[in-house]
Structures are given as C-alpha cells and as structure tokens.
A protein has these predicted regions:
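Bacterial N-terminal signal peptides that target proteins for export
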Residues: 1-10, 21
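C-terminal segment of classical bacterial N-terminal signal peptides
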Residues: 15-23
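Short, low-complexity N-terminal intrinsically disordered segments enriched in polar/charged residues
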Residues: 22-66, 70, 175-181
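Hydrophobic pocket/interface hotspot
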Residues: 51, 62-64, 71, 83, ...
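A short gly/proline-enriched turn/hairpin at secondary-structure junctions
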Residues: 72-85, 95-101, 133
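Surface-exposed, charged secondary-structure patches
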Residues: 90-137
C-alpha cells in the first residue's frame, strides 16, 4: 500500500512539473508581445505620415490631432509635457524658433508590437533637416532621433498615449555592448 501511495505521489509530482514546464513554455514565448495586424500597422503608419506632413507645414494642431487628451510626451532634452494642450503649446513655440524652417523626413519604423489588447508599442527613427542652431549654439544633431510611442486603440481609432524622443549618439551606438560579438 505504501509503495502504491509513494508511486502515485511521484507520478503526481512528475505530472505537476510537466504541466508547469508546459505552461511556462507557452507563456514565455506567446505572451511577450505579438504581431500587429496589418490593418492596425497601416493605421499607425498613417498617423506617423500625418504627423510628418503636419510638421513640414508647421501645423502643430494637426501634429497633435492623433494624441490622447492626456498624452505624455518627453522630448530629446528631457522636457516632459503632459496633455495634448501642453504638447501643442511646446511644439508651436519650437516651430516659431528652432524648427521654423525644418523638414521632418519620413520615419523609419524599427519595431511595432502589441503588448496588450489594443495597446501597441512602436519605435521609429526620424531625421530633421534645416533646424536652426540650438540655444547653446550647437547645431541640431543630424544623426536622427529614436522615438518610442505607445498607441492605444479607442473608439475613434488609434491614438498616441505616450512618446519619448532620444537623440541618437552615433559614436556611442557604435560601441553598443548588446550589439558587439
């Protein structure tokens, strides 16, 4: 009787461990982001295209049109703007100064994945030509910016909930330890 009970317990442990490994294998690979449906990719791409067009026309109302009312936006020097009105105000001022004669080139999407239902994280590189010198006197970097955006699908369509913009430092990027063999 003890041997049957012990064998049953061992079998139960193996079954439990097997189920645990099976569950881990399923969640480890399938829950870490997923592919974005083609129609959603196209809708998000269209937002980036509208923003590019708005930037190049100095139309900051159109530039922020696809943002959430409570959007968070962090620019390349760490200014943090909360709310569509703050993002609009900041970009309007910047487009009367440093970006008045600038041209935003077509963004290059580097990554897009759904992290939860109706939530997509996207990164893209953009380059700005013709920006005036910065207040420090330094030229605006021509290396480009890496932007991470969080998009949320609403009843009105996809909207930008968060954006964080970082200048690409090509010298540092050439020594990226994650990309070295």
């Amino acid at each position: 009787m003890k041997k049957v009970l012990r064998t049953g317990m061992i079998a139960s442990v193996f079954l439990l461990v097997g189920n645990l490994y099976s569950a881990m294998a399923q969640t480890d690979n399938s829950s870490i982001g997923s592919l974005v449906p083609t129609a959603d990719k196209a809708a998000i791409r269209a937002i980036l295209d509208r923003q590019t067009d708005a930037w190049n026309r100095n139309d900051m109302e159109a530039f922020v049109a696809d943002t959430m009312p409570d959007v968070d936006w962090i620019n390349i020097v760490g200014m943090h703007w909360t709310g569509r009105e703050a993002v609009l105000k900041a970009h309007t001022v910047l487009h009367k100064g440093i970006f008045a004669n600038s041209r935003l080139l077509q963004p290059e999407i580097t990554m897009m994945r759904e992290i939860a239902p109706n939530v997509v994280v996207e990164t893209h590189v953009n380059r700005i030509e013709g920006a005036a010198a910065q207040s420090s006197g330094a030229a605006y970097p021509d290396s480009g910016n890496l932007i991470t955006m969080v998009f949320v699908k609403t009843q009105a369509g996809w909207r930008i909930a968060h954006a964080h913009n970082t200048t690409i430092d090509e010298r540092a990027a050439s020594r990226d330890p994650a990309k070295k063999g």
